[in-house]
């Protein structure tokens, strides 16, 4: 078996960006042969593998289709196991737009785009190059409660048969924490024999291992254009590899080592974090312990609330650590009046819900929902549409109600009107490595993420509170 183990010194040489010598030393102190670290705008992120190494002989890294792609084509370790615009642009420049990620089936804005010249390829792959977006093609279900009334597609391709949906590739790391696979949950399967059931219902779900095995095959058939399905052994190998990966920030330019002074940042602590279906569920409480939901879902940086200074720490580093701790406290407890969220307010028949960030990011120290709960928080509304995004006008077949959206989300799987615009919330670890954010890449950085929620829910954050929240999020 081939083992790919790079020392931090080797990785630091080729990692993106230029960082201060002290940052490299900090990263060296918290990484070893089981982890690989890569620079990002906030510091360093690292991946820990429970197998003890990154096995580059795994089928994950092999071309198993007909177009040269592997899973790693769209899931780069150096980019948080997804892709970033900067990384995609480097590949375009190095290959003149012929790297396997640049394929018409889903890398281009339209599968009919002209790619005959370098300039044409740059135009054809503009969404991938500018926002790291892959085009997903899904049609309106025949039995849908709605119909497609109008299409405004700047690339002239989308129709009711196949809408063009531009989405970010989700990271293939920290998958231990998943309750839902894919943005629209299309790889999240029901299993009546399962014990993982929504509280008080008979809605039970297959294991994430099962979901990921199916997803690996579907991705190879679609993205890699494979003629034959993966073997059971290939699926199992890919899923086992993915489930052993844990990625998180290990150093921050301002706060330093994220394990200093008993803080519990970094991927090794993530690997040790308990997770199960229904842990700390916001609606039903903890499914196993039966404890009530606690908004204190994150406690990684409790020790930094009033940290002492280490030997070489200056005032700025101590203050940076306090900012991270304050941001964590804000994320846990800052009051938010949750309104107009489909999947929450409408399902519970409550126009206003008093909550906090962890009302929708309840999984302990992971930040996603611990049960399947796709929500519509307004990211696909016409008001947020940019000129490079298609816009779809949907009409309810019975009521004639209209919705204008850039992506109907889960509704294209269920056909249900109430599911228009619903998406899952992702795991929040390793955020600093993988801008832009949201399913459609509409937030270029974490400042824009915080601004969106502050404006959407009228949170009333002060400039200091915004900065503290960003400091916390980039430390994850």
Q: Positions of the model-derived regions?
A:
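Positively charged n-region of N-terminal signal peptides that target proteins for export
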Residues: 1-4
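Bacterial N-terminal signal peptides
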Residues: 7-17
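Periplasmic c-type cytochrome electron-transfer domains
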Residues: 22-476
